[in-house]
Amino acid sequence: MRAAVFVCLLLGWVGVATPRRLRGPQADRLAITLYYEALCPYCMEFVTTQLNPSMVRQDRLPFTDLTLVPYGNARTNDDGNVECQHGVMECELNAWHACILEHHDIAQSLKLIACMMRGKKNRLEKCADHYQIDVGDVKNCKKTRQVNDILRKYGKETAKVSFQGVPAVALDNVYNADLSANLTDHFDAIFCAKYKEKFNKQLNNCQ
């Protein structure tokens, strides 16, 4: 994925990521911020095969301050309209993800978003039924607001960090292009190492 990730391209440099959601004592949680877009194949692969298995199967989520930013390489034009790299459908799906994040905690949000990213169509109903999560508030969010309005704040957050491509991963509130590329291929192993380095604690199932 490291070489292929540049298919979803933007410009690259080192920047600082600002966390949006805190979950418990900061001393116990390593901040991870994912900048992504719903229909980028490499974002879909990363979320479903790297991030979600680490957070759920390896139980890293209680030790993570995880922030998801569904905007990626989208652009907001002078009229305030958002144009997404993979077209109108991606903007719609990004907005659905944003509404999920606004109305559910990160654990439920990750379940729904990872499930949705296993396909290229809107799988919200199917995923909500699978996890028995009420998404009435999510539907109302999407129904009563314009996509441009829903995505505006995520565009502003994304503008704080410039990256070479998505998925882009900031660790401990800092984005580094080389580290991000490694994280997309070896997320759990690097998370374990960085967590131990920062907190001097060895997490379960870390080698």
UniProtKB/Swiss-Prot annotation:
Q: EC number(s) in its UniProt entry?
A: 1.8.-.-
Location in or out of the cell? Secreted
Q: What happens when the gene is disrupted?
A: RNAi-mediated knockdown in the fat body or hemocyte of flies infected with the Gram-negative bacterium E.coli results in an increase in bacterial load 24 hours after infection.
Q: What are the entry keywords?
A: Disulfide bond, Glycoprotein, Immunity, Oxidoreductase, Redox-active center, Secreted, Signal
Gene Ontology biological process: immune system process; positive regulation of defense response to bacterium
* One MF annotation (Gene Ontology) recorded for this entry: oxidoreductase activity, acting on a sulfur group of donors
- Induction comment from the UniProt entry of this chain: Up-regulated following injection with the Gram-negative bacterium E.coli. Up-regulation increases between 1 and 12 hours after the injection, then decreases between 12 and 48 hours, and then increases again at 72 hours.
Please provide, in alphabetical order, the Gene Ontology terms of the cellular component aspect for this entry. extracellular region
Name of this chain's protein: GILT-like protein 2
